[in-house]
Amino acid sequence: MYHFLNLDNKTRSIMISELEQDIKNSLFYEPSSIKPEYISSYKLLLRKYFEVGHIESLEKALTPLCFKAEDKNGRKIPSNIAQTIAFSDFNRYYARAILVRAIDEGKSVSIYRAKQSLKERTESKTLVLLCNL
């Protein structure tokens, strides 16, 4: 389970605005593991779950039909691809929204782990500490 601080209506609104801006300006990153015919649906899912959902709900909405069987090099797409993509995109737009909001409100931000781990890597722990000095 992920814990996103300040994931309220204001932050969600900024996430949606950032997504729409990327789409409008052709800057939206299209995950290469998603079949081209599902990209439009994926953008709609992102908007929907940015508005009312969480990573876990987005992940559940990404059915195996959305994904290619193999990457461009012929390697099998990992079984956890929905989880990976859901986290990557939700986290990316959440982080952007938090930064936009902090700038608008004249506040600072702190780095933290959104998902607690039983076996937290030392490198990860060190990076979080260094970023908050």
Where are the model-predicted features located?
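Domain-core detector
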Residues: 1-133
